[in-house]
C-alpha cells in the first residue's frame, strides 16, 4: 500500500502549535509519595479522550494532521488522524487481541498488533504500545525518567527494538484532575513525533 497520507502543507501552523516549552524549576524525586499518588490517580482513569495537533518528522516523510484519541477501557482505544480539511486519513480501533485500521480509501486492514500494523502501512514507526501510557503522563515500561517541580513526568528515555526514544513533556493542563499533558515530543534521532493536546475529557 502506498502512503496513507496526502495532507495539505500547513507545516508552519502545526509546528508552531506543537512547539514545546520545557518546564522550569528543580525536578522532584521519582521515589516521592506525591509521584506515586499522581500515578495512581492517572491509572484510575478508565475512559478519556483528547484531540489536537500531530506531526511526524523524518528524512523520508513529514506528516501533519489533526488527531483524536479515545480510550474506552483497558486495551480498548481509537485513534483518528484527519487532514486540515477534516477528511479522515486513518482510523484505528483496538481491542484485546485485535486491531482494525481503515485508510483514506476505505480499505480495511486487521492485525493483532497496532504498533506493527501502523508502522507497516504508513511508514511511521510510532511506538503505540508505549504511547498509550506516555500520552497521559505515565512512564510505562521506562525506568529512566525524571519529574518536574510538581511531581509530574518531565522526560524519559526508553529503548525498544534497538531504538531509544527520548520523550519530553512541554506542559500540563490544569483543566483536569489529575493534570494531564498538553505537549509531548518523542525523538529517537531519526524520527520526531509531536503532539499538542487541545483539551481532555476524562471519566
UniProtKB/Swiss-Prot annotation:
A lipid is attached at residue 18 (N-palmitoyl cysteine). A lipid is attached at residue 18 (S-diacylglycerol cysteine). It holds the Pfam family LolB. Transmembrane segments: none annotated. GO terms for cellular component: cell outer membrane. Residues 1-17 form the signal peptide. InterPro entries: LolA/LolB/LppX (IPR029046), OM_lipoprot_LolB (IPR004565). The keyword Protein transport applies. Its main location: membrane. It is found in: Cell outer membrane. PROSITE patterns: PROKAR_LIPOPROTEIN (PS51257). The keyword Repeat does not apply. Keywords: Cell outer membrane, Chaperone, Lipoprotein, Membrane, Palmitate, Protein transport, Signal, Transport. One of its GO terms (biological process) is lipoprotein localization to outer membrane. It is a lipid-anchor. Plays a critical role in the incorporation of lipoproteins in the outer membrane after they are released by the LolA protein. Monomer. Belongs to the LolB family. This is Outer-membrane lipoprotein LolB. It comes from Klebsiella pneumoniae subsp. pneumoniae (strain ATCC 700721 / MGH 78578).
Amino acid at each position: 500500500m502506498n502512503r496513507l497520507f496526502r495532507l495539505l502543507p500547513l507545516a508552519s501552523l502545526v509546528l508552531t502549535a506543537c512547539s514545546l516549552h520545557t518546564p522550569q524549576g528543580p525536578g522532584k524525586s521519582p521515589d516521592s509519595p506525591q509521584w506515586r499518588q499522581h500515578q495512581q490517580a492517572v491509572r484510575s482513569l478508565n475512559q478519556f479522550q483528547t484531540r489536537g495537533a500531530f506531526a511526524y518528522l523524518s528524512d523520508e516523510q513529514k506528516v501533519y494532521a489533526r488527531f483524536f484519541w479515545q480510550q474506552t477501557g483497558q486495551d480498548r482505544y481509537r485513534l483518528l488522524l484527519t487532514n486540515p480539511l477534516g477528511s479522515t486519513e486513518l482510523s484505528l480501533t483496538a481491542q484485546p487481541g485485535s486491531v482494525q485500521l481503515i485508510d483514506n480509501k476505505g480499505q480495511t486492514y486487521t492485525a493483532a498488533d497496532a504498533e506493527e500494523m501502523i508502522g507497516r502501512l504508513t511508514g511511521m514507526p510510532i511506538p503505540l504500545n508505549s504511547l498509550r501510557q506516555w500520552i497521559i503522563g505515565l512512564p510505562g515500561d521506562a525506568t529512566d525518567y525524571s519529574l518536574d517541580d510538581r511531581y509530574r513526568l518531565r522526560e524519559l528515555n526508553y529503548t525498544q527494538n534497538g531504538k531509544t526514544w527520548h520523550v519530553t513533556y512541554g506542559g500540563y493542563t490544569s483543566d483536569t484532575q489529575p493534570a494531564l499533558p498538553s505537549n509531548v515530543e518523542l525523538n529517537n534521532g531519526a524520527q520526531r513525533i509531536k503532539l499538542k493536546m487541545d483539551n481532555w475529557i476524562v471519566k
